[in-house]
Amino acid sequence: MTKLKLGDYNRLKIVKRVDFGLYLDGGPEGEVLLPKRYVPQGANIGDEIEVFLYLDIDERLVATTEHPVAKVGEFACLEVAWVNEYGAFLKWGLMKDLFCPFREQKMRMEVGKSYVVHIHIDEESYRIVASAKVERYLDNTRHPDLKAGEKVQLLVWQKSPIGFKEIVKNRYAGLVYDDQVFRLVHHGDRCDGYVSNIRPDGKLDITLQPTGREQTLSFADTLLEYLHT
């Protein structure tokens, strides 16, 4: 079988049923527990099921059928659930909150506030952790997979003096200039945008409105909708 992916989705075979859940075949990693509360109805020994793998409070590999807001390698805007002397713990859709150590915070995180973070595996502890220092995880090299006018997915990262910084396609740094914003935009919003320019430094200029032919078609659709109201 392929190597298990911590902080990601895996398809694993059910090999044993116990009172407190199911054990799944983790290959060289050994059997992985899927606690009873997450066992799907009708699951039988020999079936393969998709599960998300993470470490429980005792740092043991465990499976869940819940879906977190994001997985390892992705960016997300997450709310702080609680803090202690080691860092902040963020809500990400699983029973165990996601840890963001103080060294990975740009400013001290506060309970109830939301922050854009990158999710990754800490090389020293092998834990799934978050980092608010997202710049180090953005790719500013050339973008062979992008072209001007292309529609892309955006995560609004932070406000700058000239516009809104965006994370483009969960990988690149982009900017929407203030004069290109014609609707309310909030920190942490996910939306679609369009590449208007690829700069020499690798960063992207983004617009929230279609460009070129797509802009004409969008305007035509809006006009037709208006005429039929």
Regions found by a protein language model. Name each.
Residues 1-229:
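Single-stranded RNA-binding regions, centering on S1/OB-family and related RNA-binding modules
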